[in-house]
Amino acid sequence: MKKITGSLLSILLLGLSITVHAEDPYKLIIPVQPTQSDSKIEVLEVFWYGCPHCYDFEPHIENWLKDLPEDVEFRRMPGIFNKSWIAHAKAYFTAEKLGVLDKIHSPLFDALHRERKRIYTEDELKDFFISKGVDGDEFSKVFNSSEIETKYKQAFVMGQRYKITGVPAVIVNGKYMTSASLTGSYENLLKTIDELIVKERK
């Protein structure tokens, strides 16, 4: 995959600063993509740990999750736009596999953006996991497993199928893609998600 330049990456990551509304606050995904749940409406957040807009969006989505409807299933998927994003994607799937997302997900965001720590390579991520109580050998085993490789490659493919051009982005039931750049604010983004959920119930 061709590496994205710094200036283009900045444009791709641009979220809250875009205030001009599109005609619709979401885009249709054609063809519709499968979801992991047959019985619930899936809401999927696509993110990158290195993205400041994703970090800013976290408290908004966490607050929204407090009142998650019973017929809605929320998932996260790391986005991958170039090779430098792969390590963070593998870190997410590793934490998920080890059952330590509660110890890793938000703290890693904080370490990168609030504490300004450099945690991008496998070794840096390993040290971070160890600091959160994860065995280093277990981390390395899972991080470099074929299962995690398959998962991050699948995430890359799905990002293309969703036609995502920046993060954070939210996919509703495999049919709609929305983001703060389309809605104008994080508050409007959550409102749009709610509206799309209602739309899917009909």
PLM ranges: what are they?
Residues 3-86, 156, 160-161, 195-202:
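Extracytoplasmic thiol/disulfide redox context detector
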Residues 54, 84-85, 118, 182, ...:
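Alpha-helix N-cap/helix-start motif
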Residues 58-65, 88-92, 105, 122, ...:
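Extracytoplasmic/secreted envelope proteins and their assembly/folding machinery
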Residues 67-97, 103-130:
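Structural microenvironment flanking redox-active thiols in thiol-disulfide oxidoreductases
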